[in-house]
Amino acid sequence: MIDKMKVRGAKVHNLKNLDVDIPLNKIVGIAGVSGSGKSSLALGVLYAEGSRRYLDALSTYTRRRMTQAAKAQVDEVLYVPAALALRQRPGVPGIRSTFGTGTELLNSLRLMFSRLASHRCPNGHYCPPTLAVAAERKLVCPQCGAAFFAPSAEELAFNSQGACRTCSGTGTIRTVDSSTLVPDESLSIDQGAVAPWNSLMWSLMTDVCREMGVRTDVPFRDLTEKERDIVFNGPAEKKHILYKAKNSNQAGELDFTYYNATYTVENALAKVKDEKGMKRVEKFLKEEICPECGGTRLSEAARAPRLRGISLDKACRMTLSDLVNWVEGVPPSLPEEMRPMANSICESFQTVAKRLIDLGLGYLALDRASSTLSTGERQRMQLARAVRNRTTGVLYVLDEPSIGLHPSNITGLIGVMDDLIGDGNSVILVDHDTLVLSKSDWLIEMGPGAGSDGGRIIAQGTVSDIVKDKSSLIGPFLSERNPLSGRQSHTGDSLLHDGRIHLSTGAIHTVKPLETDI
């Protein structure tokens, strides 16, 4: 029976013609100082070869449309399974991605609000929950008799039919930042005081502005309120102007429509077709919470269904820990005949949610934008998704999954890895955290130094073998009898003797308003 991968002659980056056997169906930790070749072995050899060979089995037509890893610099790799890498720095998701969409918890929640909620009739009355929604039958309002179809889960999605029409489901709108239109009021309009006219509009707009009755040869700060209003908000009137070309003595006459400074930016934004064009415009813009949806991204109709007294957007504002408790109360709140369906939907939600809570993400709300999540938070989302897929025979390469993880949540991380092994997979774990590495079934230590001083295996075996190995650098730290002592710490006011940084902040994401000295 094949029970190990065989790597022969690995020369990726700083690896020194490395030969190593790596157990299959085990948690294999790779330790070592930064730059010792840990990731070169895990990602540059094992993942690169595992993913490349899997893709090589596909047709040429299919492979053309997929990104493939280059062949690793290695003489031979035998018995490597198809590989997936959960990288240290997952890509930053787009503006439409949230914690709820990234974990797919929002799919289950939308299904709850579609199938199990009280829906509003066209006349504003709420109908009690009914199985007619799941049967795709019309609901009949008991108060006014109006017949209507309840919204589907798709109609409650802000990336689809449930999007707010004002912000198109992003939760924010871009408006003109008036403070950027005239950055230096000591300049006159002739000297280029109105910034959008210099970069987004024809220079002729200065001449048109003069025809609108605005003085263009005095400092902008000396203009009257009426003149300033014409610059910022004046009407689109056509004016007859005389102009002189900059590079010649020729002059001419022209009828030209006046574009005020604000409309100049709005017009340019509407015509943006690429990133280069957006960069020219975005310096005049600011982002604000959408006034229509209040940042929820949902249309008014998508916010209408009520389940346990609240709407979908309010459920998405709850932290995951609070939401799990709320979902537990959904089935008992419904009529008896609806509870089997409710239990099924809620169970699929709870299974994923509890895994994320085990990984220490219970403080996040489903409406939190993915772009604001830390690297460690996004990587743990990847981990939870990997376990949910219930694959077998796959090599999972985890690159420092303990980043940002509190010691109290290490148990959840280890539980995820145990589940992957239990499903018949193999796990390669690159990490520095001794608490995580100590749970490995097999440990490979790279070193002894970084760069050209690394790339060799200085110790390998079980954790107990590494602890006994005198050549191991990490062995003493894995032992409970670690003879190494920590640096002496300062106490009291002596810490701030050489000065301090004062930090004061308002509320942002999970941070409450606070003040502290560092």
Please report, for each region that a protein language model flagged, where it lies by residue.
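Conserved hydrophobic alpha-helix in the ABC-type ATPase nucleotide-binding domain
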Residues: 412-413
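Conserved catalytic segment of ABC-fold P-loop ATPases
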Residues: 419, 426, 438-445
